A protein has these predicted regions:
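Alpha-helical transmembrane segments and adjacent TM-loop junctions that form the membrane-embedded core
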Residues: 1-14, 37-39, 43, 51-298
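The first (N-terminal) embedded transmembrane alpha-helix
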Residues: 15-25
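Short, hydrophobic transmembrane alpha-helix segments
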Residues: 28-39
């Protein structure tokens, strides 16, 4: 694991402390101002605190070496954490939209002054937290999900500032639930790709590889007659696993090993596959297709 894609203990402590502070400030601010946007953001930040803890624990578990019970290691722990965080974000966003619609149907007065001050504090703290997590978020799905949690809160708080100014100047209280709805829609828009990628990895969906081109390149190796029974999946967002059956001319095992090495080098260098497993055959499966469709022969 690269250190720049992990939360250090200090970052974890700072982000958690900032989120706890924001939660308390926004909860009190929401109660005293009557702002649904602040109250919803407070609960959102509370969820963020839990997501940061979950992400940190998962990143530590992911550092564990493989063992007889987890032969591929523990990297999937971070994918599971990303999945949970993404689901939580979408559920919270849906709840906020429902509550905002209720507030639109039954408007309530909002103290724009308190709302503005609290939103400014929340925005600054959230942007600091997002900055702390930004390093490594591009290459780590777990950190990306957590980073999106915090960034969505920062944008939410910024939206609340705009809403508070409008309420303070023009007394348009209805802007409070409207801002909440807009921010919630944005959160779902940003979170959906993370959820989709996490589901694909957990379901062992094939990565974006050109399998026909891979087969064509493998068939160029002298002695390779056919390639079939291909499987490709990802352990995490960075590591691709690949297995295939290859039909070879009948020859000594000592002559097969150089073919293995050449094919492994090809797949690793050209297609960025991290782990290659090849099964050599002579007659079995010689006319089979690239992919098996038999559920009993996966």
């Amino acid at each position: 694991m690269h250190e720049d894609s992990k939360m250090s203990g200090l970052k974890f402590l700072l982000v958690t402390a900032l989120n706890a502070l924001i939660t308390i400030v926004e909860l009190l601010g929401g109660i005293f101002s009557g702002s649904l946007a602040l109250l919803s953001d407070a609960f959102h930040n509370l969820g963020d605190s839990a997501s940061v803890v979950l992400a940190y624990v998962a990143s530590r578990i992911g550092l564990k070496n493989s063992d007889p019970s987890k032969t591929f290691g523990y990297r999937r722990a971070e994918i599971i954490a990303a999945f949970i965080n993404a689901i939580f974000l979408i559920v919270v966003s849906a709840f906020l939209v429902i509550e905002s619609i209720r507030r639109l149907l039954n408007p309530a007065p909002v103290d724009g002054g308190i709302m503005l001050v609290v939103a400014i504090v929340g925005t600054l703290a959230n942007f600091v937290s997002a900055w702390l997590l930004s390093r490594g978020a591009k290459s780590n799905l777990n950190l990306k999900a957590t980073y999106l949690h915090i960034l969505s809160d920062a944008l939410s708080s910024f939206g609340i500032i705009i809403g508070a100014i409008i309420i303070q100047i023009w007394q348009i209280d209805i802007i409070d639930p409207i801002v909440t709805i807009l921010v919630s829609v944005y959160i779902v828009w940003e979170t959906w790709p993370v959820l989709k990628e996490a589901i694909n990895i957990l379901m062992q969906a094939a990565p974006n590889l050109d399998f026909e081109a891979m087969k064509a390149d493998m068939l160029k190796e002298p002695g390779v007659v056919n390639v079939h029974h291909i499987h490709a999946w990802q352990i995490d967002e960075n590591r691709i696993m690949f297995s295939a059956h290859i039909n070879l001319n009948d020859q000594l095992l000592s002559d097969v090993e150089p073919i293995y090495r050449h094919l492994e080098s090809l797949l690793q260098k050209k297609y960025h596959v991290d782990h290659v497993t090849l099964q050599a055959e002579v007659f079995r499966g010689k006319s089979n297709e690239l992919f098996t469709r038999d559920q009993h022969d996966i």
